[in-house]
Amino acid sequence: MAPPAKVAKKPDGKAQALKVAKAVKSGVSTLQKKAKKIRTSVTFHRPKTLKKDRNPKYPRISAPPRNKLDHYQILKYPLTTESAMKKIEDNNTLVFIVDIRADKKKIKAAVKKMYDIQTKKVNTLIRPDGTKKAYVRLTPDYDALDIANKIGII
């Protein structure tokens, strides 16, 4: 059998009252009223409290989002109109219908990846039917007519 544990004695009421009376006489600040803070500003700014980092039990999204605009979706198809053919012959420029969300840098990267050609610049416009047209100007070391034959435009 274990030895009896030592139990701390509770101070009796009279001793505790004497202790409190002594503290009051000496002027201990625990028993005095707290002085009110004087506010000089009209607006009240709520104090900043501790914000813990989020630690979720499970992820709310099951799969990471995939890129919906890849190179094959950016370039829809090349234009084969007479004006587009004239651009190919005269200005060393290919004309494509592209995705409406694609910007010039994405169009340039898609043309480079799909056809292995360097582009000098890309001009875009949105047609009245709501599609985006891109004029892809090639560098002088590439011939737009040869590229058009390779693609199958001509």
From Swiss-Prot:
Q: Which UniProt keywords apply?
A: Ribonucleoprotein, Ribosomal protein, RNA-binding, rRNA-binding
Q: Name one GO biological process term.
A: translation
* Pfam families per the UniProt record, alphabetical: Ribosomal_L23 (PF00276), Ribosomal_L23eN (PF03939)
Q: Name one GO cellular component term.
A: ribonucleoprotein complex
Q: Which SUPFAM superfamilies does the UniProt record give?
A: Ribosomal proteins S24e, L23 and L15e (SSF54189)
This protein's record includes keyword tRNA processing: no
Q: Which domain of life is it from?
A: Eukaryota
List the Gene Ontology MF annotations in alphabetical order: rRNA binding; structural constituent of ribosome
* Family per record: Belongs to the universal ribosomal protein uL23 family.
- Tell me the function of this protein: This protein binds to a specific region on the 26S rRNA.
UniProt name for this protein: Large ribosomal subunit protein uL23
Which species is the source of this protein? Fritillaria agrestis
What lineage, starting at the top, does this entry show?
Eukaryota, Viridiplantae, Streptophyta, Embryophyta, Tracheophyta
What gene codes for this chain?
Answer: RPL23A
